[in-house]
């Protein structure tokens, strides 16, 4: 059974552990400020629990441009042993629902092509923004 729960000051360190286990430090390094700012984003950061074990997390941030809101996914990670159990999908659905409830018009993520996860997002309704594609990053977005 998959359950989601808030990230709070008492369990914040778990986010760091999940990210360290899921992301190659040569590709992605999260600065200390990323973790410090996590508590302030409220519902835009959640843990995923599988049978009461914390196995994943999503962390987003809200952006406002010309009175229009967008949500950027900064981290979406599931521990390798728990992948292919719809946990990542549940975290992504939660992020999209929370973004829509907050009146965001779009949700997006910038990825390193080295991560090789673009197809996962495309299968969940995201599209590649070809105009922002570089050799170091690809932007995928979904209208809400």
Curated annotation (Swiss-Prot):
EC identifiers of the protein: 2.3.1.-
Keyword rRNA-binding found: no
An example Gene Ontology molecular-function term: protein-N-terminal amino-acid acetyltransferase activity
Domain N-acetyltransferase per the UniProt entry, residue ranges: 2-144
Organism domain of life: Eukaryota
Subcellular location per the Swiss-Prot or TrEMBL entry: Cytoplasm; Nucleus
UniProtKB keywords: Acyltransferase, Cytoplasm, Nucleus, Transferase
Primary localization: cytoplasm
Pfam families: Acetyltransf_1
Gene3D superfamilies in alphabetical order: 3.40.630.30
Top-level enzyme category: transferase
PROSITE patterns: GNAT
GO biological processes: mitotic sister chromatid cohesion; protein maturation
Gene Ontology cellular component annotations, sorted alphabetically: cytosol; NatA complex; nucleus
PANTHER family in alphabetical order: N-ALPHA-ACETYLTRANSFERASE, N-ALPHA-ACETYLTRANSFERASE 50
Record family assignment: Belongs to the acetyltransferase family.
Protein name stated in the entry: Uncharacterized N-acetyltransferase C663.13c
Annotated source species: Schizosaccharomyces pombe (strain 972 / ATCC 24843) (Fission yeast)
């Amino acid at each position: 059974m998959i359950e989601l729960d808030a990230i709070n000051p008492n369990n914040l360190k778990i986010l760091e552990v999940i990210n360290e286990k899921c992301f190659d430090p040569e590709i992605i390094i999260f600065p200390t400020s990323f973790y410090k700012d996590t508590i302030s984003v409220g519902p835009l950061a959640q843990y995923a629990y599988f049978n009461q074990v914390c196995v994943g997390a999503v962390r987003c941030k809200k952006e406002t441009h010309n009175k229009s809101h967008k949500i950027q996914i900064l981290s979406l990670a599931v521990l390798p042993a728990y992948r292919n159990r719809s946990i990542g999908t549940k975290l992504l659905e939660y992020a999209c629902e929370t973004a829509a409830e907050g009146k965001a018009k779009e949700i997006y993520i910038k990825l390193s092509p080295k991560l090789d996860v673009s197809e996962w997002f495309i299968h969940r309704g995201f599209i590649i923004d070809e105009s922002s594609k570089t050799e170091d990053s690809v932007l995928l977005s979904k209208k809400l």
